[in-house]
A protein has these predicted regions:
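Transmembrane beta-barrel strands of outer-membrane/channel proteins
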Residues: 30-36, 50, 64-68, 77, ...
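Surface-exposed extracellular loop regions of Gram-negative outer-membrane beta-barrel proteins
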Residues: 6-39, 43-49, 168
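Residues on the lipid-exposed face of transmembrane beta-strands in outer-membrane beta-barrel proteins
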Residues: 17-21, 50-54, 101-105, 116, ...
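C-terminal beta-signal and adjacent terminal beta-strands/loops
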Residues: 122-123, 239-285
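Gram-negative outer-membrane beta-barrel transporters
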Residues: 118-120, 141-226, 280
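Outer-membrane beta-barrel signature, preferentially recognizing the C-terminal barrel domain
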Residues: 40-42, 55, 61, 68-122, ...
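Short loop/turn motifs that connect adjacent beta-strands in outer-membrane beta-barrel proteins
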Residues: 22-25, 58-59, 109, 162-171, ...
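Outer-membrane beta-barrel translocator domains and adjoining extracellular loop/strand segments
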Residues: 1-7, 40-47, 75-82, 89, ...
Length: 285
């Protein structure tokens, strides 16, 4: 039988204060979270946040946000110990500060979004390998990996064909691209990371929805992405067939229809062709 030899206890208390201000097309939401976690001490710590948006007209929206946050190490991070994982009871909580800015545009038949972000983290927690011995044994240990800065942007554009051509058999076309740049500062030579350093640098998505016959339609998705630190870029193609009625919906979904073998975050081998089917019923309640 499995024996559990570690236990922990901590109480987390949150007090939230928020105020919303609306004037014309301008909206401001500001707040602060007071947090006390007995896993640290009995003191309250304060984490502010601000969200702003401005709509000069019905087509445009501009927005920005900033917030601070704290993440406590989990009990797995602290206590686990086996042949492939080693926790650390001396972990510090990780601290994050994130700033986002963006704009949205919408008109008949077309929508677009452009956004950017900057995230600064200290004492970031990750599972890593720092020696050849750990690599040979496929063993990871958890640690605070230092300072981590992530910055990037996202661009999305969507064409709603039936708002432009009412009888078009193509209903929607979507194209998106996301990019992330990462700057990591640490005094430890990290050979392999499971999470934080295996970031998604490039991601391109293409989507197409169209009618087939009567109430039968299809939705196609093509995704290309490149994850850093030892991952090969790959392309994944998915398709979903749907029959829509007023009272119910039936679908069949095929993920990775090219049966491409690929690995994603934490070096886990992903499934080949994956087929799912389902239905939903509208009860009219």
């Amino acid at each position: 039988d499995r024996q559990y030899t570690r236990k922990g206890e901590r109480t987390n208390t949150n007090i939230m204060l928020e105020h919303n201000f609306i004037f014309g097309g301008f909206t401001l939401s500001a707040g602060v979270l007071a947090n006390k976690n007995t896993g640290l001490d009995n003191d309250f710590r304060f984490y502010p946040g601000v969200d702003m948006s401005y709509r000069p007209n019905d087509n445009w929206k501009f927005y920005a946000s900033w917030n601070k946050a704290l993440r406590m190490p989990t009990y797995t991070d602290l206590y686990i110990s086996n042949v492939v994982q080693q926790g650390d009871i001396n972990l510090n909580p990780e601290k994050n500060s994130t700033f986002k800015v963006g704009t949205q545009y919408r008109q008949a038949g077309f929508a677009a979004t452009v956004s950017g972000f900057y995230a600064h983290g200290t004492n970031m927690i990750d599972w890593v390998q720092t020696s050849v011995t750990e690599q040979n044994d496929s063993k990871y240990h958890v640690m605070n990996i230092g300072k981590l800065n992530n910055m990037g942007y996202n661009v999305d554009a969507t064409i709603y064909m039936r708002e432009l051509v009412p009888n078009s058999f193509i209903t929607r076309i979507k194209l998106g691209y996301a990019y992330i740049y990462q700057d990591h500062k640490t005094e430890t030579n990290i050979l392999k990371s499971l999470y934080a350093l295996e970031y998604l640098k490039h991601k391109v998505v293409f989507g197409l929805d169209h009618q087939i016959w009567n109430k039968l339609s299809a939705s196609w998705s093509v995704r290309w992405q490149q994850r850093m630190n030892g991952y090969h870029p790959y392309t994944k193609v998915d398709c979903k067939l749907m029959w829509d009625e007023k009272k119910y919906n039936i679908f069949v979904k095929a993920d990775n229809i090219t049966c491409h073998r690929y690995y994603d975050l934490t070096a886990v081998k992903q499934p080949g062709l994956w087929i799912m089917a389902g239905a939903s019923v509208n009860l009219g309640w």
